[in-house]
């Protein structure tokens, strides 16, 4: 009898200990803010996808090195999409419920963004598409869960035309000019078309649309047409190997690189480094940042991570264009959580729904950005229920044969053109999906 009681007591004690251990583990897990990381480190777009992923992951590591988000440490898990929409959706489904639930997804693909836009509201997980994705999702009154922070492709297209206007000596000088858009034949590439058509109608220039099939290595027919028509300017809405191919074709055709403008996914080191001096004069838009090797945040990453063997990827790529894009995209994800903690509790893990409120109420002032190490890199970003973009500043940088350098002042996209376009497209989406615009009460939730 005594033996039985001792065994029973021991069993209860072990059960209690196990319960305590499970509770401790669960508590430890819930004290981490989970960020799924969709990447493409393999495939045709890997040369551009890898540096972005390295910058993104390094910033998450840096946050932990700084002590977390008000003490809450960050956890993350990568999932390889290969830039394929179906694989991106698979990654979303696999990671959305992990480690207490996903905070936010950043698809790094307009195609994946379109697919997840349909899923995120039901799962109550926000999407950040910093400088890409659906341009009309800047309208937060319709797209409650989408945040194209810092700009959209319509902002990019508008600012490129503004720089061309300056180059030709005024808007009136655009009349009769010919601009050719060479674009990746995908949702990403097609995003440029509406704003350029709008500007063409305003200024009276001819717009030619020249699609290029994935992945973009076959452009012979495109450049035969450009050689024949000799447009005044060529816009490159490319990604991955399409960009270097385009510049090589331009070189072979004798088309002046000074008259070519790339979207910001076509204006990084992998796009030009193999061509070097042959790409000199090529322009690309930057949604605020460029290569920022001298920035405070880069110095901190090198000191706190790479100097200790904890960095992600090659040390000499830290601060390059796409690395910086990953870095600042991760920063947006973190700062939305920090903002949410102001409402829902400092030092607490935020749900995706709570984080969404943070992204909708971002107020990244210049002093805040400077304190985070982004002085001279980013301008203030402030979102609201109606405005999920938060800023519309951009610059042009130009390849000088060995590095990118800024060649323009700051531009702001023309809201008189873009806002009506955004509203019309958002209204069309709402009608198709049978959605109502958000009420003031919903905006406060």
For the regions a language model picked out, list residue spans one by one.
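Extracellular/periplasmic periplasmic-binding protein-like sensory domains
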Residues: 250-330, 411, 425
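Venus flytrap/periplasmic-binding-protein-like
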Residues: 81, 127-129, 133-138, 215, ...
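C-terminal segment of classical bacterial N-terminal signal peptides
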Residues: 15-25
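Beta-alpha junction/loop-to-helix N-cap segments that form part of ligand/metal-binding clefts
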Residues: 32-34, 47-54, 66-140, 149, ...
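Extracellular/periplasmic Venus flytrap/periplasmic-binding protein
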Residues: 86-90, 135-136, 144-254, 292-299
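Signal peptide-proximal N-terminal region
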Residues: 54-76, 169-172, 201-204
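Segments of small-molecule ligand-sensing domains
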Residues: 310-323, 334-409
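Periplasmic-binding protein-like
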Residues: 95-108, 126-130, 178-183, 209, ...
């Amino acid at each position: 009898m005594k033996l039985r009681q001792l065994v029973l007591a021991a069993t209860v004690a072990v059960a209690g200990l196990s319960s305590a251990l499970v509770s401790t583990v669960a508590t430890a897990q819930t004290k981490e803010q989970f960020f799924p990381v969709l990447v493409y480190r393999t495939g045709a777009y890997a040369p551009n996808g890898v540096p972005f992923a390295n910058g993104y992951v390094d910033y998450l590591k840096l946050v932990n090195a700084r002590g977390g988000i008000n003490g809450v440490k960050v956890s993350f898990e990568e999932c390889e999409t290969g830039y394929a929409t179906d694989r991106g959706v698979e990654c979303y489904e696999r990671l959305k419920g992990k480690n207490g639930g996903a905070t936010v997804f950043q698809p790094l693909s307009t195609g994946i963004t379109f697919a997840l836009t349909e899923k995120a509201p039901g799962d109550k997980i926000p999407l950040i598409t910093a400088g890409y994705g659906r341009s009309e999702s800047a309208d937060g009154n319709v797209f409650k869960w989408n945040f194209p922070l810092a700009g959209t492709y319509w902002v990019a297209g508008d600012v490129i035309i503004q720089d061309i206007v300056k180059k030709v000596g005024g808007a009136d000088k655009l009349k009769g000019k010919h601009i050719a858009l060479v674009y990746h034949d995908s949702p990403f590439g097609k995003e440029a078309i509406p704003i350029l058509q709008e500007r063409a109608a305003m200024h009276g220039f001819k717009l030619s649309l020249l699609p290029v099939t994935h992945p973009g290595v076959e452009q012979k027919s495109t450049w035969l047409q450009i050689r024949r028509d000799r447009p005044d300017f060529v816009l490159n809405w490319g990604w991955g190997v399409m960009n270097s191919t385009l510049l090589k074709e331009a070189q072979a055709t004798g088309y002046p690189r000074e008259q070519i403008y790339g979207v910001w996914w076509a204006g990084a080191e992998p796009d030009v480094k193999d061509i070097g001096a042959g790409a000199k004069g090529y322009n690309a838009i930057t949604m605020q940042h460029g290569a920022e090797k001298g920035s405070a945040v880069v110095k901190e990453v090198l000191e706190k991570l790479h100097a200790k063997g904890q960095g992600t990827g090659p040390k000499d790529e830290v601060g390059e264009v796409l690395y910086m894009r990953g870095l600042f995209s991760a920063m947006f994800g973190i700062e939305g959580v920090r903002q949410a903690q102001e409402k829902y509790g400092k030092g607490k893990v935020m749900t995706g729904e709570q984080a969404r409120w943070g992204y909708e109420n971002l107020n990244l002032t210049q002093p805040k950005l400077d304190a985070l190490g982004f002085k001279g890199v980013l301008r203030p970003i402030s979102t609201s229920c109606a405005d999920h973009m938060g800023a519309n500043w951009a610059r042009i940088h130009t390849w000088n044969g060995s590095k990118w350098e800024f060649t323009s002042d700051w531009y702001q996209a023309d809201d008189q053109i873009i806002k009506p376009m955004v509203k019309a497209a958002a209204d069309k989406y709402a009608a198709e999906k049978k959605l109502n615009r958000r009420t003031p009460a919903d905006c406060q939730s």
